Regions:
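Detector for glycine-centered tight turns/loop "hinges" at secondary-structure junctions
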Residues: 19, 62-63, 228, 269
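Short, surface-exposed secondary-structure junctions/capping segments
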Residues: 14-15, 44-48, 249-254
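Terminal accessory/anchoring regions of large secretory-pathway or extracellular enzymes
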Residues: 102-285
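Residue-level detector of short, conserved catalytic/binding motifs and their immediate flanks
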Residues: 6-10, 55, 88, 201, ...
Length: 285
């Protein structure tokens, strides 16, 4: 899959005979058990087990988004509203064999799938379903496009799109860097008492404009959270590389999901795609 691609052109005409509460267009399924971002759920000798490690979106407004996948303890549904998306899909960005150590099914070779609308899809949302799993045999990830307009009996719907089965996204950005790793750990500073209720997030970025940025440039992380408190945020160049690393601590009470958002800036210039993450505190207890 590293050097091959398969293209499929889809042209669908739908004529519902009854009202449909949730019509999923261009559905994809996948499997995500555990990876760098949820090591606490490891139940196997292999370091990582997943067909894809993230949902990527290229919005109608031009924003590039990367959302790492989760293996929740209960079914989670998230919607990402958009108008006329340029594309979205499930990617396997981690291509290092030693991150999986599987010479039977070769998770490092699993394909990425990119959905490219070839017409205007209007208003709606990319919906992501994450289902609990404790084994690699279950497809527990689902994505699809959900139109905003109600689907009524007797209406007509037309959707055209192209499926790209590739190693990475077919239209990589030339203007922003991409997320390469998402890691979690205990909040605080080594050698000092660790505060309770805190989690450290470490996100690596690579490529794009970062190849031109010097390590002393004043790159800043822009972080936001739906609840809780952000502390100790910073960004630095990874020694010996052109990659940059952003990190921050999150302090939050309760077990409700927390939605996080981060990207890197230099002055008024956006350097990276947007990292979205849904932190599930209850999975760490």
């Amino acid at each position: 899959i590293k050097t091959q691609q398969i293209l499929m052109d889809i042209d669908a005409n739908l004529y519902p005979r009854q009202d449909i509460k949730r019509l999923g267009i261009a559905p994809l399924t996948s499997m995500f058990w555990y990876a760098e971002n949820n090591r606490h759920q490891i139940r196997d000798w292999r370091p990582e087990i997943h067909d894809n490690d993230g949902l990527t979106m290229w919005t109608g407004a031009g924003e590039r988004i990367w959302r790492p996948l989760n293996n929740p303890s209960s079914v989670m549904t998230n919607s990402f509203a958009d108008t006329n998306p340029k594309g979205f899909g499930l990617l396997q960005r981690d291509r290092a064999f030693y991150h999986y150590e599987d010479d039977g099914v070769f998770y490092d070779r699993r394909p990425s799938v990119w959905i490219e609308p070839t017409g205007e899809w209007g208003e709606g949302a990319i919906q992501l379903l994450e289902i609990p799993t404790d084994d690699e045999i279950h497809d527990n990830i689902v994505i699809y496009w959900l139109p905003k307009e109600p689907v009524k009996a007797g209406s007509e719907w037309h959707y055209a799109y192209r499926l790209h089965w590739v190693a990475t996204e077919p239209y990589p950005s030339e203007t922003v860097a991409r997320v390469s790793h998402t890691r979690l750990g205990n909040a605080g500073i080594p050698g000092q008492p660790r505060p309770k209720g805190g989690r450290k997030f470490v996100i690596d970025f690579e490529g794009g404009p970062l190849n031109e940025i010097a390590k002393l440039d004043k790159v800043k992380p822009v972080v936001s959270t739906s609840k809780g408190r952000i502390d100790n945020e910073y960004a630095l160049q990874v020694v010996g590389t052109k990659n940059w690393r952003a990190a921050f601590d999150l302090y939050v009470e309760g077990n409700e999901p927390v939605n996080l958002r981060l990207f890197l800036k230099l002055g008024d210039r956006t350097l990276t795609e947007t990292w979205l993450y849904q932190y599930l505190p209850f999975t760490y207890d």
